[in-house]
Amino acid sequence: MKNLCAIVTLAILITCGACQAIAGADADSAVALVKKAVAYYKANGLEKALDELSNPKGQFNAGELYVFVYDQKATMLAHPNNSLIGKNLMDVPDADGKLFRKEIVTTVTEKGSGWVDYKYKNPKTKEIEPKTTFCEKADDLILCCGIYKK
């Protein structure tokens, strides 16, 4: 009986640890996807990169994780939702009125890369939820990938 309790306890601890690892991997996955997109852009050029980054079935759209691209004025250059491409979103606030795209531009201009927090409607839950986006500057582009905070 003691062995059974020990096995069950160990299984619970392993499961909890795995859940934490998966939750923590979201941020790592977002960073990795942006880094992969930057490398793709540098290897293939602007036109091919924007085409691939705008492809809803492309290698940079992994369901909840996808890369989108702004120029330095927060005009959308690439996004799996093609209806956003060409729109200047600099002055479009989040649910709390925060001009987070201005913060994205400032962050990459000053630091080269970084995380920006804001609130956004989650398409899965239809609720406004806290979100954070990793952004990195590559030449005049800003490549980003966001995750909902859990």
Where are these regions (language model features)?
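N-terminal membrane-sensor/transducer module of prokaryotic signaling receptors
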Residues: 2-150
